[in-house]
Regions:
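Short glycine-enriched nucleophile-adjacent loop
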Residues: 13-23
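Stable alpha-helical elements in mature extracytoplasmic
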Residues: 12-15, 78-81, 111-115
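Divalent metal-coordination and catalytic microenvironments
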Residues: 4, 92, 119
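Sec/Tat-exported extracytoplasmic proteins
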Residues: 23, 32, 122-126
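Gly/Ser-rich "nucleophile elbow"/oxyanion-hole loop immediately N-terminal to the catalytic nucleophile
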Residues: 1-10, 14
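Alpha/beta-hydrolase-fold serine-hydrolase catalytic core, especially in secreted/extracellular enzymes
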Residues: 88, 97-100, 105-158
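Solvent-exposed, acidic/flexible segments
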Residues: 21, 56, 108-112
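The feature captures the conserved acid-bearing segment of alpha/beta-hydrolase catalytic domains
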Residues: 26-105
């Protein structure tokens, strides 16, 4: 197996980041999640891995943050992670739906559309799927209420 994605939602996003250094991983998807700052780590779920923000330095693959906008309880943690990542291509997408995302909608709603495009691009090299994220006028911005931020390495992707 050569194309492995690791993804998680909420606490699962913390587990994804805990395992980010695995050399088999080709891409990461962090959904409605982000590492706690040391100042708020005490409010984390007991028994969950709680890596420090320095763990982000171990990421070696592309990474997508899919967040639920400012009303998402994980918004600040996820956006803080995104802003700290400058050594691999990273992007942060937001849809103002809160922490529950669109998972309860038929077929996963908008989140599923974006997640599948990411996976098709990152794991299969699908150029059409890449258009969802790449460029100043990426297809994501044509979808209702979505926003996207990209780090400098992401902006340079061909």
């Amino acid at each position: 197996v050569k194309n492995i994605a690791v993804a998680g939602m909420s606490c699962g996003g913390l587990q994804t980041l805990y395992n980010c250094a695995d050399p088999r991983i080709k891409t990461l998807m962090i959904c409605n999640s982000g590492l706690f700052n040391q100042s708020n780590a005490g409010s984390a779920v007991g028994g969950m891995p709680m890596p420090p923000k320095e763990k982000l330095n171990e990421i070696h693959s592309s990474i997508l943050y899919m967040l639920g906008g400012e009303s998402d309880i994980a918004y600040e943690n996820g956006m803080d992670d995104f802003k700290r990542i400058n050594h691999v291509p990273a992007c942060a997408t937001n849809l103002p739906v809160g922490h529950g995302g669109t998972y309860g909608q038929p077929h996963g709603g908008e989140y599923a559309i974006v997640a599948l495009a990411w996976l098709d691009w990152q794991l299969k090299g699908d150029k059409k799927a890449a258009k969802m994220f790449k460029g100043d006028k990426c297809k994501l911005l044509e979808r209702k209420d979505w926003t996207i931020e990209k780090n400098e390495l992401f902006k340079k992707l061909k």
